[in-house]
Amino acid sequence: MAITKDQTGKLSAQVYALVRACPKGRVTTYGWLAGAVGYPRGARMIGWIMSATPANLNVPAHRVISKEGVLTGSKAFGAKDRMRTLLEEDGVSFEPDGRVDMKRFGWDPRLDLNPDELREVLDSAQTLRVNPPDTLLRLLNDDPASPFKLSDPL
């Protein structure tokens, strides 16, 4: 099942709306976001979408980390430790090994929002206009790890 550019834009907007809903002082994961938009095995897809985040949408992308509490997207923030600094400014603290305590700071939209709140956040994505890059569309359609590629019949 291929995904169109329009569908990619709508999916990206839902992801960005969820990240914008993540409260200051909390973090979420690629996997939790993937599950919230209906693709529980799509964590890598969320990483691709996050790497294409338009600056004008004011998405607090620094709040998206790995399920282990590791700052896997930190290279996207330029200066070394910039992602960590942004999280610390949000009120997130770090363990001695540099990880975030996910039990303390984790925010899973499927658990921390009731179904009506989750639907409201996803519906709010309609106000976000996202023009995804062609590279994202190619990844979603062609990469073996894409949930859209995985759903193709053998």
Regions found by a protein language model. Name each.
Residues 2-154:
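Nucleic acid-binding interface residues in structured DNA/RNA-binding domains
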